[in-house]
Amino acid sequence: MSKNKAHITVNDKKIELSVRKGTLGPDVIEIASLYKETDTFTYDPGFTSTASCESKITYIDGNEGILLYRGYPIDQLAEKGDFLESCYLLLYGELPTKQEKIDFDRCIMQHTMVHEQFARFFHGFRRDSHPMAVMIACLGAMSAFYHDSIDITDPQQRMIASIRLISKVPTLAAMAYKYSIGQAFVYPRNDLSYAANFLRMCFSVPCEEYKINPVLTRAMDRIFTLHADHEQNASTSTVRLAGSSGANPFACIAAGVACLWGPAHGGANEACLKMLQEIGSVERIPEFIARAKDKNDSFRLMGFGHRVYKNYDPRAKIMQQTCHEVLKELNIQNDPLLDIAITLENIALNDEYFIEKKLYPNVDFYSGITLKALGFPTEMFTVLFALARSVGWVAQWKEMIEDPAQKISRPRQLYTGYAAREYIPIDKRVN
């Protein structure tokens, strides 16, 4: 390979391909001309070696354990800023000035109300419906309630839709939770912070005044920030794929929520908590460690390893600290699940098997314990993930729509089915 070119030979035909260099990360070989030049496609199941787009939003270095939003390390954003500051950063590319932050916060909080007909919309679901099923429906329904902001060719409508999604998803998520437990919906309060408002909508009841706890509010805000974006993962790619067809933003985000519901993607923290409950006690950990190492055993240690990170997940360190702060604030001492988690973490960081396979604790490892301590049932965990990730999806969708090189996505395939064959009348068919 030359400095800016790659050469490939297919069936004795040699072609030259351009090599593009990003700000960070591996170089990328442009293969758009490959089919035209050689009548061949590339084959990359799961897109593990394929850059599907050009983006300026989020960067991950899995080998070094680095996650950047617009160039800023995730730990600095989570510890020094707040979620809406990260929202502004992801949407506009720069951290806001003091006045820009005030104006943006006010804009978001002024749009937290949802159409009153949504209350009746919820009553169309069974009470025991999974909150993610309800969220998918609600996000799709937003295009019916807010059809004045679905023209993707209008920059003003794109921005209005973006603001509405970021501001209203917490309200819909809280309504989904309240509906599932048979309690009255709680209207948002615009004088509260984003995280405090969400916690109040989830946990306040008419019979007593809800008191804002700054430690729990800060924990919720950090969880939102840590999950705001994560490059071109399955759900983000789904949003981009749907958006490439010209679908309205509400439909695209609903598609992202549907993808996130998959247990291999957004359900990891719920699965991790269930695993800790299955282990039950510190004394049983060796048994489950042995099972995890046994290739013939289907058991997997959830919360360890990551498809991208081959080092310690930078979000996990902040999540661990946040978890301890919440447990201390709520005076949860000697929590058996936390004891199991800490013991498992120590084993993973010192056991040769885990070190060799680079199975480090990820963000899901501690987030499940934290969310449980905050009072959320496991069915709400992925809903909270979707709430936080909405801003990342919106930023990625907006970037894609505004890219002049954008075109409808059309993946290819390696076809291994039958070649053309003649139709056989039904009375002449045999097994």
From Swiss-Prot:
Pathway: Carbohydrate metabolism; tricarboxylic acid cycle; isocitrate from oxaloacetate: step 1/2. The keyword Transferase applies. It catalyses: oxaloacetate + acetyl-CoA + H2O = citrate + CoA + H(+). Keywords: Transferase, Tricarboxylic acid cycle. Pfam families: Citrate_synt. Its EC number is 2.3.3.16. GO terms for molecular function: citrate (Si)-synthase activity. One of its GO terms (cellular component) is cytoplasm. GO terms for biological process: tricarboxylic acid cycle. SUPFAM superfamilies: Citrate synthase. The active site is at residues 306, 364. Citrate synthase is found in nearly all cells capable of oxidative metabolism. Belongs to the citrate synthase family. This is Citrate synthase. It comes from Bartonella henselae (strain ATCC 49882 / DSM 28221 / CCUG 30454 / Houston 1) (Rochalimaea henselae).
